[in-house]
Swiss-Prot record:
Gene3D superfamilies: 3.30.420.40. Its EC number is 2.7.1.60. InterPro entries: ATPase_NBD, ManNAc_kinase_bac, ROK, ROK_cs. Homodimer. This is N-acetylmannosamine kinase. One of its GO terms (molecular function) is zinc ion binding. Keywords: ATP-binding, Carbohydrate metabolism, Kinase, Metal-binding, Nucleotide-binding, Transferase, Zinc. Catalyzes the phosphorylation of N-acetylmannosamine (ManNAc) to ManNAc-6-P. It comes from Haemophilus influenzae (strain ATCC 51907 / DSM 11121 / KW20 / Rd). It catalyses: an N-acyl-D-mannosamine + ATP = an N-acyl-D-mannosamine 6-phosphate + ADP + H(+). The lineage of its organism: Bacteria, Pseudomonadati, Pseudomonadota, Gammaproteobacteria, Pasteurellales. Zn(2+) binds at residues 156, 166, 168, 173. Belongs to the ROK (NagC/XylR) family. NanK subfamily. It comes from the Bacteria. CDD domains: ASKHA_NBD_ROK_EcNanK-like.
Amino acid sequence: MRCLALDIGGTKIAAAIVKNGEIEQRQQIHTPRENVVEGMHQALGKLLADYEGQFDYVAVASTGIINNGILSALNPKNLGGLAEFPLKASIAKHTDKPIGLLNDAQAATYAEYQLQNSEQVSNFVFITVSTGVGGGIVLNQILQTGSRGIAGHIGHTLADPNGAICGCGRRGCVEAIASGRAIEAVSSQWEEPCDPKEVFERFRKNDEKATALVERSAKAIANLIADLVISLDIQKIAIGGSVGLAEGYLSLVEKYLQDFPSIYCCEIETAKFGQDAGLIGAAYWVKDVLLDKPEGTIYG
């Protein structure tokens, strides 16, 4: 089966045909920034038209929460006016093929899980530490999406009850402490302001302030991992994202995990899929759902 996969992010929309895990005819456009609702309708219509007659189903990975085909977000700023956007209905105007939708981090999780031996690893988590902190959870070999599409929003678990207010409105979320956005919120106030990329450059040069800031992030992720392991019996975790894959970051996380009793720890690895994890994961997931549900029931 040939899939038209879409990956909708805050700044870009990627599209490609996915067949047998291989990407073909990939293209990328900017996410609309003005007249965003109408702009998104038009962008989706154009992408569907570009691939007309070349696919058997549509799989969409999107930032935010997918619930009954509607796109929303815990942090409305991430969608820039697309809150409560009828994503599935918008796509359905342009195709009669089956459509499946899920969160982009959930999709990336499913892609990463395809690389695991499911007989040995039945409980798996993917964590992305990037502009925000997100993830996905596989339990008993099944990706958890939840009844409202919010399963895996692990960046909005508690890290510090006295911490900064998160974009979701709660105080002290992991995302408000560990993310690239949280790092920049601090580093932009320094006497010599810098972005997260430069923070890590200074960290690797043993700059005291940069090191403290990166360590704060890594500690929050280490504690998140410990919470996930002890609450869900997670066997392996993959870490990705621009912060998560930054040189020296994963070793810091592992260092802090060593301070915990061993029952709180599991095997940690770097994520293997890059920018196309959402496309591939969404294509795999929707195909598996279609195969498991012959009547054509599609989640999202």
